[in-house]
Amino acid sequence: AFVQEPLPY
């Protein structure tokens, strides 16, 4: 499983 880091909006 891959960890998705929060992307800056």
UniProtKB/Swiss-Prot annotation:
Keywords noted in UniProt: Iron, Metal-binding, Oxidoreductase
Picking any one GO molecular function of the record gives: superoxide dismutase activity
What Enzyme Commission number(s) apply to this enzyme?
1.15.1.1
- Cofactor binding summary note: Binds 1 Fe cation per subunit.
- Catalytic reaction equation(s): 2 superoxide + 2 H(+) = H2O2 + O2
Listed under subunit, the entry gives:
Homodimer.
Q: What is this protein called?
A: Superoxide dismutase [Fe]
Which organism is this protein's natural source?
A: Anabaena sp. (strain L31)
